[in-house]
Design a protein with these regions (language model features):
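Short beta-strand element of the alpha/beta-hydrolase
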Residues: 3-10
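Active-site glycine-rich loops that stabilize anionic/oxyanionic intermediates
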Residues: 10-13, 73
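Active-site loop/oxyanion-hole signature of alpha/beta-hydrolase fold enzymes
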Residues: 16-23, 28-70, 81-86, 236
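Short beta-strand immediately N-terminal to the catalytic nucleophile in serine-hydrolase-like folds
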Residues: 69-71, 96, 191
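Flexible "cap/lid" loop of the alpha/beta hydrolase fold
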Residues: 80-85, 89-129, 133-134
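Conserved alpha/beta-hydrolase catalytic His-Asp/Glu region
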Residues: 103-107, 121-182
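Conserved serine/cysteine hydrolase catalytic core
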Residues: 156-209, 218-220
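Catalytic histidine-centered segment of alpha/beta-hydrolase-like enzymes
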Residues: 219-235
Length: 242
């Protein structure tokens, strides 16, 4: 596909997580910051639909009517929220280390607790708490530069954005209806890191089942942030598709 490709970042980082992918995908890439992260202004209501609306506004300003829309983790949730409200503008999906299912009650409680902690204590603790779940064991053992980059990305975010995102993700709906509604016609690439400690392989398989034109790629040696951990391999998977 030669369409522009929108890649939406994971939590709790910003669009710089895609910098290593840019040399391979080049000018096709559009990587906006989601509300409150990086240079993006915040929104008040904790709703990923508002993040999707912000992405659509960004595409409008660029004069782009249709694009491949993708994202990693939280970015994948926003991509599916965008597909829900504007399916005609999505020519393909790239879903990376993400899932279409809603949170469990336990996961929601954990998100609300993290939001409250970020608001009361800042986010100086966040990198230490999340590092071993965000990065795969191979990265933790053999790619110290990725850990340094991730710590810098997390430290650069605002506590209010962290709190907003956690509450917004807690409130997101199940998106399998959206995938099934678009699936017969929509090409999709589903990518997961083989060492992802947060989202199991079964979630990728469930999304693939809802998207008949999907391709599933598992990247060895990567965890939950595969595009940051092994950007060349991720870019190659995108370039080979569909």
């Amino acid at each position: 596909m030669s369409d522009p490709i929108v890649l939406l970042h994971a939590f709790p980082v910003d669009s710089r997580m895609w910098d290593g992918v840019r040399p391979a995908l080049g000018e096709r890439m559009i990587t906006p910051d989601l509300p409150g992260f990086g240079s993006a202004p915040p929104v008040d209501e904790p709703d990923l639909g508002l993040a999707a609306a912000a992405v659509l506004d960004h595409l409008d300003r660029l004069g782009i009517e249709r694009a491949i829309v993708g994202g990693c983790s939280m970015g994948g949730y926003v991509a599916m929220a965008l597909l829900r409200v504007a399916p005609a503008r999505v020519s393909g999906l790239v879903l990376v280390n993400t899932k279409a299912s809603a949170d469990t009650e336990e996961a929601r409680r954990n998100r609300f607790a993290m939001a409250a902690r970020a608001e009361s204590a800042g986010i100086g603790w966040l990198a230490d708490e999340m590092l071993t779940t965000l990065l795969g064991r191979t990265t933790l053992e053999k790619r110290p530069e990725v850990e340094v980059t991730l710590r810098e990305l997390i430290a650069g975010q605002k506590p209010a954005a962290v709190a907003w995102a956690q509450r917004a993700m807690a409130g997101r709906p199940d998106s399998f209806d959206v995938l099934r509604g678009a699936g017969a016609e929509l090409p999709a690439l589903i990518v997961r890191g083989a060492e992802d400690a947060l989202i199991p392989r079964a979630e990728a398989d469930l999304m693939a089942g809802a998207l008949p034109r999907s391709t599933v790629v598992e990247l060895a040696g990567a965890g939950h942030l595969a595009p940051l951990e092994i950007p060349a391999e991720f870019a190659a998977a995108v370039s080979r598709w569909p």
